[in-house]
Structures are given as structure tokens and as C-alpha cells.
């Protein structure tokens, strides 16, 4: 590997010449200098960064990792990337005793500079398993899940560096976030080949990843094959069943947990309440909510109240859900108000929807869209349009739906009306064919979801090209008949897509597993595991 050497005195001279009588050059505390650097976020702040950097060298703080990283990041924000690179290369040229590569990578990842961390890694000669673990874990923290898996693959190319438990735990987390079953199985296989002994963290991670990738059967198999002496493993299984709408299984696991004398915690009950909410088990949910404090002395937290509000709202008890919010001993958060807003949309209660919006101090695009949909579904077009105008005035944009799936070892992504895929023409041809076939079997689009008071034909056109429909058309195009289909989506699936996919599952006699922001939907023979309750 070629190393680039930069003269230390040259760096010092460069910094010292930038000194002036500014406030940054008068600071002596490294903490204050760090704050100054973090406050520099635009090209107009370049001079301040140079002065702070000069003061850092003058005071002998030049090799402090936290200040180094802050300086590099500040240069990047101020469009001085060449200075950021020079500084990093200089630091990498120092002796190993001075240059702590792992600390630098960790610090860069913490502030979201994964690109710079990767450059540091490329120029570092003294890499070890910790170095790579910091890269993999950092990518996961920065929501770069595919990069995390690439890092694991690159790590395996070194004969003297072997992945350990931390490597695998982070990689499994990446697979879970992606819903990538192919790579989840690959990581699991690597663990077995490496002879890794499972601990509670890895056991729960395996149960969790298979559940989140849509393979609840394998998740169950793993659960019953490992030592279940830690509550986290039980929680992973209960939560997995909850997201798949398998209430009976989740409740059974809780009973087994009690029989094996494993004490539940607050996460256990959150999983149970979520299960009850997703499956419409109102009375059972109320019982578990009371059981928490009555038998186990676990005081309900904000998320438990949120689950109860969600449970009541989904059951159509929207007014009762609002009354629970009003009686809470804890200040309700935005999640709870959004839950009320969502149930107000489902059960067409614009009055409570407006109350929810008023209590969202920083309402997001999805909140306004929900309120707009409430008005649209009740034919109050003028009110719906006012909400959209308010969004436009406030500069709030609707979050775009995105769907993705793994096929052929690659992640394929789609957005509504997408034409960027290499096989776009074939995808749309398959989709149009499916739309016509489902229509001939009696499917009717749910045009109440479309905002504007336009013709029914135009409304239907707006619904036909949602991201999950394009993803489904692609996988039908590429996969063999009869195989299971797995698709992920970043936001809640609309009722039109939900009903249409039910129709497709019956039409093609295929199982379609769809994971949206709320839960898993297993479509089979024209039915969904959520029982139209999500």
C-alpha cells in the first residue's frame, strides 16, 4: 500500500500563518475550540476554521483525535475538502504510537463522516478486527446498511483478520434493517463456519433478523434451538410474532417464558401490546397493560401508553383513545398524537384529527397527509386542499414511498411512477397486465384516497403506480411461479395497494410477504394476515 508522507513542519507553518487576533485564535481550551469548529457550517466560516486550526497547533493539540476529526469535518462543511484530505494524510503519516487509527475512524463515524472514515481505512497499514468492526458498526449507525455488508466482505479478504461476535452482530443488524434474507442467511452461515459460540446478543439478533426478513419460520426454529436464558431472546421472538400478526404464537411464547422462570421486562409487554393492537385483541391488551404493574411491578412508560392508544384507535374506539391520552400521567409525545391522527383517518373523524394536528408542535409531512386524507375520504375537498396549501406554504413535502426487494444478490429499489430501472418497460407491461386481470375479477380501486376532486379515471391512474406495485411487478417478472415474494416499504401501505395485492395473491396463487412501516402482511389466496387491520 502506498503511503503519502506530508511534512509536519509544513502543516504547522500553514496553520500558524492563519493566526489572527480573532476570537478563535484567543481560545486556549480544547473543548471551546471544538465547539467553534462544530459551529462552522458554511463556506463563509472558512476563515474561522483556519484560525481555530492554527490555534490548535499552536497549543499542541494537533494530534488530539476529537479535535482532528472536528477540524476535518469543518473543512468539509466549508468546501475545503482538499485541506481535510491533507490533514488526514498528515495524521496517517505519524508513527503508530501517535496515530490512533481506530479512534479516528470511530470519531468520524460518530459525526456521520463515513466517506472520510473509509479514506482513513484505505491509507491505514495497521488494520485489525477492531478497525473493521468500527467500520461495519459505523455504517449501520449511519443507515448505510449495504456498505456495512460490503465492509464485512472486504474484511474477509484478509487472512490475518477474522470477524468476531461484534462483526456478526452489526452485520445481522444491517440485514434486519434491509430485510435482506439472502445476506442474513449468508452471515448466519459464516457464523457457523467460523465456530462462533452464540451469546444472548447473537441469539436474539438471529431471531430478530429472520423475523424482520419475513422468514418467521426460521426465526422460530432458531429461537427453539438456542439457550433461552436471557429476556432479550424471548423479547425478540415475541416482537417477531407481533410484527407478523401472530398473536396466538406470541402469547404462547409469553406463557413458556413464565414457565421457564424468565422475568419479563418493559420490552416484553410492549411486544405483547403491539401483538394485541395488530390483531384487534382489545380485551387481552387491556389485561396485559394492567398485568404489568399489578403482578410484575413494571410501571407503564410512554411507549406502553402509545401502544394502548394505538390498540384502542385500531379497534375503532377513537374517542376512548383520546380520553386515555387526556388521563395519562406522562406528557404524550408526537408518536401518540400521530397514532390518534391515523385512527382518526381510518374511522373518518376529522374533529379528533384536527386536535391531534394541533398537539403536534412540529408536524411532519405524513401528519398533514393523514389529515388531508381524512378530509378527502369524507369528500371535504376544500378542507383537504387547504391542508395541502399549508404544507406548500410551510415548505413541507410529502415523504415519498419507496419499496425494495432482494433478487439475484442485489437490492432493487422503486419509487412511485419510477422509470429508472433497467427493465422499466417489461415491469410496466407486467403491471398493466395484472391491473387488467384483477379488474376482470372484480377489483375496484379505492379512489377515496386521492386528494383532488377529479374524475374517477384520473384518481385510479394516480394509484396504479405506487412503489410496491412496481416492485411486485418486477419480482413476478423475474421469479419462478409459486415462489414466495418478499417486499419492503418505508411507509405505511395504502388501502388500495393492500386490497390489490390481496387480489394478486389469489390471481397468481402465490404468497406475497410485504413489510411496511407498521408490520408484516402475508397475502395468500386473497386474504392478508392482518385481517385488514393495520
UniProtKB/Swiss-Prot annotation:
Region (Type E(+) motif): 409-439
GO MF annotation list: RNA binding; zinc ion binding
Keyword Secreted: no
Region Type E motif: start-end pairs: 336-408
Residue numbers spanned by region Type DYW motif: 440-534
PPR repeats: 128-158, 164-198, 199-229, 230-264, 265-295, 301-331
Keyword terms: Repeat
Gene Ontology annotations of biological process type: RNA modification
Domain of life: Eukaryota
PANTHER family xrefs: PENTATRICOPEPTIDE REPEAT-CONTAINING PROTEIN (PTHR47926:SF360)
NCBIfam families tied to this protein: PPR
Protein family (similarity comment): Belongs to the PPR family. PCMP-H subfamily.
Name of the featured protein: Pentatricopeptide repeat-containing protein At5g50990
Organism the protein comes from: Arabidopsis thaliana (Mouse-ear cress)
Lineage of the organism: Eukaryota, Viridiplantae, Streptophyta, Embryophyta, Tracheophyta
GN (gene name): PCMP-H59
